[in-house]
Amino acid sequence: MYWYISFLRPPPVSVTISSESLLVTPQVANDLRTELRYEPTKIYYTWQRIAPKSSEPETLKELTTFMPPASTYKPLAIPLSLQAQVEDSWRLGLFSCRSRSENCKDAEPEPINHLLDLVQQPKILGVWSEGIEIIRLPGGMKNGAVRGMGKQKERPEDAGRCARAKKSKEKEKERYDVPKQGRIHRELILPLVRQDQQPSLKIIEQTSFDLDKKVWDSGLALSAWLHEHLSDSMTLPPLGQRILSLLTQKERLKVIELGSGTGLVSIALSLAHPNQSTSRWDITATDLESAMPLMNENLVLNSLGIVHLDHVVDDTISSRLSVDAKVLDWDRPLPNWVAEDPPQLVIAADVTYNTSAFPSLLSTLSSLICPPNDSNARPLLLMAYKERDSGERELWQMLKGQGIDMVKIDEVKGCEDYGFTEIWVGGTDLS
C-alpha cells in the first residue's frame, strides 16, 4: 500500500488579501482514507501561483509532524505567500520527505513525486490543492495590493478597536462561512521520454466518498510498473514479456481498461507511448456514466483525449495515439463498439474490491477474453490486484471456470515494504 497526504479539512475556495493565514487539517492515510499512518510524518507546505501567470513552487517550509491521534482533527494555520496579490490564484502543496527516513535528515524535501519511486523506493505522496483565489473585502484594498502593504492609515484612537473587530470577524468567517474546496491534485514526474521533455502525470481526485473519483493503490502500482518495464522487459517472466511485446509491436494495438475511475492507468500508459516504436495505440478507458466527466477532465489535463490530440503540436504522436473514455457497464452486455473494434489487451486495477459485483465482472471479462468461436482474437488480461479481503480471490476460480487462466508474474512492494500489489496475466491460451 501507499501513504497519501490529503486534506481532512480542505483549504477555502478563496481568501482575502488581508488574511494572514488559512486553516487546513492535513492527514496521512491509505488510498481510501480508512487507515491513518501511525508513524511520525513530517509535513511541509509550499505555495505556487497558477494565475494570471504561473510561478515555480516556493521553498518548502515545515508545517507539522503528523502523528495520530493528536493530529487527526487538528486544524493548522498556514501563512499565505508574501507575494500574493488580489486576483491571483495560488495553490497549496503539502509534501513529506524524499526518502523513507522519518526524520528527513537523509534528504531535503521537494515539492515533487516521481512515478518510478512507487516501484523502487515508495514514498509518501504529496498533494496539491486547487487554485485559491485571492480576493479583497468590499470597500477594501485596491487591485494589485500585496499582502501586508498599501493599507490605509487609521486614526490612532480607532486602530486598536477596528483591528480587534476585523480580526474577530475574519476568524468567524474563516471557521464557519467560507466555502471549502472539493477536489485535490496529484502530480507524478515521469521517466524521461524525450531529451527535450520530462512530462508529469496529473490526476484530479474528488474529496467526496465516491470510489470512482479517487486514486487507488493498484492503479498507481500498475502505472509505475508499466513505465518501468516498457523500457526493459528482460527481467520479467515469459508471460510478462508477452504483455510488453504487445505494447511494443509494430502493428496497431487496441487496449480497453475496465473500471478506470479517474483514468489513471490509461493516462499513464498513453504517456509512455513516445518511448515506443511507430506503432499505433488506441486506448479506451471505461467506467460507469458517473465517472465520465472527471475522467475526461483528466485526459484533457494530460493533453490526451481524441479532441485534444487532434490539435497537439506534435502531429507524429497524435497520429500514433488515440485515447478516449466510454461507458462500459458490467451489468449490461458489451456495447457494440467493443465488437466493432475488439481489444488485444484488457487492463484492470483494483476491480475486485466489491465481491457482490463478481458475477457482473465475470460476465464482462468472459465476453472480452473469450470472444465468439468465429473470432481469431485472443486478448490478454493485465490485472493489478491488492488484497483487501481474502474472499476476493474467489474470482480466480470463477475465471478458471470460464476457461480463463490467471498467472501472477510480478509484485510491486508498497510503502515500508508491506501491502504488495500483485501483477497478473490472464487469458485462454497462456502456453
Annotate each predicted stretch with a short phrase.
Residues 1-431:
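S-adenosylmethionine-dependent methyltransferases
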